[in-house]
Design a protein with these regions (language model features):
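N-terminal beta-loop-helix "entrance" segment that forms/cooperates
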Residues: 24-48
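Glycine-rich phosphate/diphosphate-binding loop of Rossmann-like nucleotide-binding domains
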Residues: 1-33
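Short, ordered loop/turn segments at secondary-structure junctions
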Residues: 4, 29-31, 58-59, 80-83, ...
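Glycine-rich phosphate-binding loop
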Residues: 41-80
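Short coil/turn connectors at secondary-structure junctions
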Residues: 20-23, 47-51, 71-75, 88, ...
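Short, glycine-/small-residue-rich phosphate/pyrophosphate-handling segment
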Residues: 83-108
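Short glycine/serine/threonine-rich phosphate/pyrophosphate-binding segments
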Residues: 6-11, 34-38, 57-66, 85-88
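Hydrophobic/aromatic ligand-binding patch that stacks against planar heteroaromatic rings
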Residues: 16, 66-69, 94
């Protein structure tokens, strides 16, 4: 997720993964504020056994697209409500990926 303010929503995904017995990593890295850290973390994900990323982000929601650009396996983008537009900005950001950067979008 891109910010600790996203933890309230994204922790629900963690609960579901735990109930299903699926191991996971939960990390907070901003695509806008920490791009180098995001690149390093994402490029090493597959070697750590990660098979799918669930990337939650609000507002401009660059995180899911950046993850998809750097990670060869599936990325699920979760648009989160920001300060404006009730999360619709994040929905459109995640749904409008360029060709070759696939992101599945899951919204509540």
């Amino acid at each position: 997720m891109g910010s600790d303010s996203d933890l309230k929503v994204m922790s629900k995904a963690a609960v579901m993964l735990e109930e299903l017995g699926i191991e996971y990593e939960m990390t907070i890295i901003s695509a806008h504020r920490e791009p180098d850290e995001l690149i390093e973390w994402t490029r090493g994900a597959e070697s750590r056994g990660i098979k799918v990323m669930i990337a939650g982000a609000g507002m401009a929601a660059a995180l899911p697209g950046m993850c998809a650009a750097l990670f060869a396996l599936p990325v699920i983008g979760v648009p989160l409500s920001g300060k404006n537009l009730d999360g619709m900005d994040a929905v459109f950001s995640i749904m409008q990926m360029p060709p070759g950067v696939p992101v599945a979008t899951v919204a509540n």
